[in-house]
Amino acid sequence: YYPGSEKLNPDEMRVVACGTGMPQPRLKQAGSCYLVELGNGDKFIFDMGKGSTERLAALGIPTDQLNKVLVSHLHFDHAGDFPSFWLARGVNAARQPLFLWGPGGGQNPDWGIKGWSEKIKQAWAWDVATRESSGDPRSTQLTVTEIDWKGVNQLFYDENGVKIYSIPTIHIDQSIGYILEWNGLKFAYSGDTAPNKWFLEHAAGADLAIHEVMLPPDMWLDKYSMSHTAAVMSGTQGHTTPRAFGKIMEIVEPRMAVVNHAQIDFDTAPVIEQEVRKNFQGPLSLAVDFMVWNIHKDSLTTRMTIGNPEAYPPPAQVPAMAPVASDDDYSWDPFSFSGLEPRTSAVTNEVVKEFNEKHGTNITPVVSNIPFQKK
């Protein structure tokens, strides 16, 4: 699949894996992230683990169309790239606000998606302040909605024919999974979880059922040099083994079962599939980054996406809004300008002058010209 080369049919769903890996960083697989595109024009991003922003950018989709993010839980391999995605919107021609959904606080209310997002704003306040005075103010606007993490089959989104439900998961308190239904199609995303009854019931019959899997305990001994106890705890508790995944899918009976959250390599993939097949014989995908599924009511295809590693931001979809001046606007300290040097600044100003002559503009350099302006 070459992004931008195929228009979705009005009744079609396309799902692109923009991150399929584990907490351990690796170039091959980013943290969990799935883009769901619908034939009605809606797009939803489920999780945004570390490294996923670059995968999304490689699809060449206008930034304003990627304005709905749903997070399953706040571990960094599922939410770690959200700050980068949010901050990059201004330099990627965003002209619309961003919407974020995620679980509310469990034992500590501040640990919910709202408290988390406020801390992100605080941590990156300098970045936002130094950019938004010259950018579209809508690009950093963020609307956050908390979801009750104990809600079972809880409808929290119902717009444009799309319904999205949350289900609890058994991972850490304050973790959820998602079920999206549209046009007779069903997408199920488990987030991180041990096998649980809620997914079995509410993901049943899904067209695409994405569920986490961890490597078998023996592989944790080999790949991560863990103790026997740590290998068992990491590979089986609060997560799902490949064999248990097979049992889950035997019960759920999806049109396509998708293994997520596992390192898919030449030596791990055969073991994972062998374990899954002990209980499940249906259609199966071992997800890797850029795998894509096109889903119709009467067909389902699995391919690989050829992303653009040299992508530039697509053009903005709506006109820019002028920056809004306020007393909180960032202003330069005059000390910074004392470091400018006439000979090198003159070269910069020469470039600006040539640009003005070429394009018929009259743009005044705001930095390189300041110390040398005539009084």
Regions found by a protein language model. Give the residues of each.
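A general structural signal for short secondary-structure boundary/capping elements
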Residues: 118, 232-238, 305-309, 330-339
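Cap/insert and terminal regions of metallo-dependent hydrolase folds
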Residues: 184-186, 194-291
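Extended, charge-rich low-complexity interaction segments
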Residues: 314-347
